[in-house]
Regions:
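Acidic, divalent-metal-coordinating active-site segment for phosphoryl/phosphodiester hydrolysis
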Residues: 178-190
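Non-catalytic terminal and connector segments of soluble metabolic enzymes
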Residues: 18-19, 163-174, 187
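Acidic, Mg2+-coordinating phosphoryl-transfer loop and its flanking beta/alpha structural elements
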Residues: 192-197, 202-203
Length: 219
């Protein structure tokens, strides 16, 4: 199985955003990961549907929009209309996640659920039938460039076992936070099928080369 790579534009140069997205596509990215933060659920404030619409114009790659905000259900239609292909929200941010997942599916886009590092994996079990993607955070959400939390490897293994036990091995298992050349093989071995990488792609060096190196290290 070939792991999917989803560069996070949170670490891109926003002055040249279209170029940065195009460079990711040229380097073999499978998805573009877009971090949306509201300054309430997480301390940082990033972007909204207008920027997602601009990214949509810049690429044909599918857009993985990660909603780190309160009241995620209110934002399904705006981000769907802006061009999102998959919407992921945090279990911790929603009192009625089942309704939100149903609303995302009804909107015609993929549905993802994110779990913070301190949230037990088993809390996703009642919702797994509605998921296209389960996101295991390997940092605390809200800021780019954080260090990978090693316990995320065990959590990925538990998540993979849970998906298999629930007959949902087809569900993407994504990891986000601190993934670099020296640990990408570990997260793939632990069960991740989709990897978000920010500073490892948009930090030092050429974006295309960085992505190819990550792909090689993941094999």
């Amino acid at each position: 199985m070939t792991v999917k790579l989803a560069p996070s534009i949170l670490d891109a140069d926003f002055g040249y955003l279209a170029d940065q997205v195009e460079a990711a596509a040229a380097g073999g990215a499978d998805w573009i990961h877009v971090d949306v933060m509201d300054g309430q659920f997480v301390p940082n404030l990033t972007l909204g549907p207008m920027v997602v619409r601009a990214i949509r114009r810049a690429t044909t790659l599918p857009l993985d929009v990660h909603l780190m905000l309160v009241r995620p259900r209110d934002w399904i239609a705006p981000f769907r209309d802006a061009g999102a292909d998959l919407l992921t929200f945090h279990l911790e941010a929603d009192l009625h996640p089942h309704r939100t997942l149903q609303a995302i599916k009804e909107a015609g886009v993929g549905a993802g659920l994110a779990l913070n590092p301190g949230t037990p994996i088993l809390q996703a079990v009642p919702l797994v039938e509605l998921l296209d993607l389960l996101l295991v955070m390997s940092v605390n959400p809200g800021l780019g460039g954080q260090q990978f939390i090693p316990a995320a490897l065990t959590r990925l293994e538990r998540a993979r076992a849970m998906l298999q036990a629930e007959n949902r091995a087809d569900c993407e298992l994504e990891v986000d936070g601190g993934v670099k050349l020296d640990n990408i093989a570990d997260v793939v071995h632990a069960g991740a099928t989709m990897v978000v990488a920010g500073s490892a792609v948009y930090g030092e060096g050429a974006v295309e080369v960085n992505l190819r190196n990550l792909r090689g290290a993941a094999a």
